[in-house]
Each structure stands twice: as structure tokens, then as C-alpha cells.
């Protein structure tokens, strides 16, 4: 599902059962695995040199691992990885990788706690 006014870069890769809410920018070279939720107004970036990388410089979008959840208004820096079943709270700015099954929040995003077992997505059979 892709929400209204959202844009997906031509080189982005999306898995199955991905939900992209309204007004999301999913940049090229982003990788989104199965069962991911992306809240409204999320912005991803893929260029940490702001077009001044020089010869051989490559763009790198974020990677969102299986069943992670990204809250509204989150900003994901180039190349960050959001771990499997991780939760990024609304308004966070993620500049470093987020470990699997953790909750992060803040600017910059910091680990607050682990995601409780009862909040994990059960694998589909």
C-alpha cells in the first residue's frame, strides 16, 4: 500500500506487505523488506556528501529490515539500517544503525529499550 502524495525513487526496492503512509519520500537505493510499516511524512536520504562526492562516489539509501516500524515524521540518514522488528518513534532523526528489536527515539535517535515479545510480528506461514 502506498499512501497519497508519497514518492518512491526509481531504484528503491520494496518487499511484500509493505505499508507506506501519506507524504513519504522513499529515496532511490532504499531497501525495504517484507512487512515494514512507514508512517506519514517519513523522509529518507541517500547522499551524505550533498552532491559533492567526487568520482566513484555512490549513493546509498537506508535499509529497513523485516517487520520494522518507522513512525511519522522520521528522517533516515543515508546508509542507515533499521533492524528486524525495530521501532523508530515519531519525529526521530536516525543517523546510526538501529539494532533489531529495539525502540529508538529522539534527535539524534537513541535506543530506549527492547521491543517486548508480545509486540513482535508473528511470522507468516
Describe every region a protein language model picked out:
Residues 115-124:
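A glycine/serine/threonine-rich, flexible loop-to-helix segment
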